[in-house]
Amino acid sequence: MNWFTRVRNSLGFGPKRTTDKDLWVKCPSCAEMLFAQEYEENAQVCPRCDHHGRISADERLRQLLDEGYEVLPQPEVAEDPLKFRDSKKYTDRLKQARAKNPHADAFTVGSGAIDGHHAVVGVQDFGFMGGSMGMAVGTAFCAGAERALRRKCGYIVVTAAGGARMQEGILSLMQMPKATVMTRRLREAGLPYIVVLTDPTTGGVTASYAMLGDVHIAEPGALIGFAGQRVIQDTIREQLPDGFQRAEYLHKHGMVDRVVHRHQLKHELATLLGYLQPAEAA
């Protein structure tokens, strides 16, 4: 027995302390270590650099809607009609995503009020397969629009998606015109359709309902575009401006109406509903 072993054995060690792994979070922008409770109480906005973190659909609904709102059930759709498989079965990917998420797919609809103004809010959750748009997302989007038409109130959609869901092929792309038809019905009914663009909003979602709103609001720093910057540069063989797909650049060039901090978003939406919503609904 050497001296180190003797000393170690003579020391009295208390029980091993356990630490909650969720006690701290690291800001993806400034890399600052943040106390998780402080971060959550600040609407998951970094108090150091003001980076807006990605949040779940449930948290978004809690932030935007008054107490007592209703979460609509997820419409039933055919699962995996193409029997798709890449490195694993599509059905297995869905099971994995659902094991980490309380909802059946990436689009959740809440019906309630925003500072007293009746509203239906649809939220895409990037945490569920990158928020990708498939049949379930398209059907849920339309169900939210139908609820707004019945209630004669505004429809607010918060986007966060990597694009169409490749595992559903053409059936995924069919959701683009389907959602577009619903936005037209809202317009014909004189009901406001407001889009909140969050990080990231790309691909087929950007090419359809994300850019068809009466008003487009973006969160600070949100990535918004169709194709990625590298793909565009390789196609046009030109260097693109810094931040050309970020919310602030798009606002400066007229693609976005407002860039609104998450802390002010609920008030901003309530103000817009007061202006745009029919008197009986407002």
Swiss-Prot record:
Designated name of the protein: Acetyl-coenzyme A carboxylase carboxyl transferase subunit beta
KW Kinase (keyword) present: no
Organism: Erythrobacter litoralis (strain HTCC2594)
Entry keyword Coiled coil: no
UniProt function note: Component of the acetyl coenzyme A carboxylase (ACC) complex. Biotin carboxylase (BC) catalyzes the carboxylation of biotin on its carrier protein (BCCP) and then the CO(2) group is transferred by the transcarboxylase to acetyl-CoA to form malonyl-CoA.
UniProt record similarity statement: Belongs to the AccD/PCCB family.
Self-association and partners: Acetyl-CoA carboxylase is a heterohexamer composed of biotin carboxyl carrier protein (AccB), biotin carboxylase (AccC) and two subunits each of ACCase subunit alpha (AccA) and ACCase subunit beta (AccD).
Zn finger intervals (C4-type): 27-49
